[in-house]
A protein has these predicted regions:
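Long amphipathic alpha-helical segments with strong coiled-coil/leucine-zipper propensity
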Residues: 52-127
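Repeat-mediated protein-protein interaction surfaces in helical alpha-solenoids
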Residues: 1-2, 80-89, 126-143
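Residue at a conserved register position within TPR or TPR-like alpha-solenoid repeats
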Residues: 26, 109-113, 161-162
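Alpha-helical oligomerization segments
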Residues: 146-220
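Amphipathic alpha-helical scaffolding segments
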Residues: 104-105, 124-128, 172-181
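N-terminal alpha-helical scaffold/docking segments in eukaryotic complex subunits
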Residues: 1-67
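Alpha-solenoid repeat scaffolds
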Residues: 117, 129-136, 168, 183-187
Length: 220
């Protein structure tokens, strides 16, 4: 029988404390980050008072999150810090006004993932981010900008799903992309199909991409 350590606080509070530890360690490597301590302290203080995983009705929490994310992006801080702040916002259903740095952090984590389990975890985080930012970005008002976070997030979501080779995840991500980026569906599946024709790609992956490609390019 193995002994399990006792944790104080709910899972959200534990995650926020772990973020605080990562932040303090990052400060030792980059002294510029010390200026952000009031914001990180506030995340912990809110968790202590309201719990770590509940919707917040507090004023200015969205500004707190956006400020931290913008500062982390400006200082080019370690991506995991931005991801930690974003996860705090997701747990509390706080809208994120600064999305690009989080999208980039998730892309890096996806690129570094080596196992199906790691890819599935990134998939879940991307799914949560899409749910959080949909009210803010779903109008997709910057369609002329190929680097806009709404587009990059959905493209990365679909690519991560393909890498999992999980049919259900691919179907979910493809449905999300089809709805979010109607003008780019055909192009995405054309490029994806060219890649999955290589040997060694699972049949389920190829079949699903072929079906979407046919759906959105037939009759062009």
């Amino acid at each position: 029988m193995s002994l399990q350590p006792v944790q104080f606080g709910d899972e959200g509070q534990v995650a926020t404390r772990e973020l605080a530890v990562r932040y303090r360690e990052a400060c030792l490597r980059d002294a510029r980050l010390v200026a952000l301590r009031p914001g990180f302290d506030m995340l912990e203080a809110i968790d202590r008072q309201y719990g770590g995983s509940r919707r917040l009705e507090l004023e200015d929490t969205d500004e707190l999150v956006a400020g931290l994310l913008n500062d982390l992006a400006r200082l080019r801080a370690e991506p995991e810090l931005a991801l930690g702040v974003a996860l705090w916002a997701m747990r509390h259903e706080v809208e994120m006004g600064a999305v690009e740095v989080v999208v980039n952090a998730l892309a890096q984590r996806s690129n570094n993932a080596k196992s199906p389990q790691e890819l599935s975890a990134v998939f879940g985080l991307m799914q949560g981010l899409i749910a959080n930012v949909t009210p803010l970005l779903s109008a997709d008002l910057e369609r002329s900008n190929p680097e806009r976070p709404w587009r990059i997030l959905h493209i990365n979501f679909a690519i991560t799903a393909i890498r999992t080779e999980d049919p259900a995840m691919m179907d979910f991500a493809f449905d999300a992309l089809d709805e979010a980026l109607p003008g780019e569906r055909g192009g995405f599946y054309s490029e994806a199909l060219a890649l999955v024709l290589a040997p060694g790609v699972a049949p389920a992956v190829r079949e699903r991409i072929e079906a979407r490609h046919l759906k959105w390019t037939a009759g062009r």
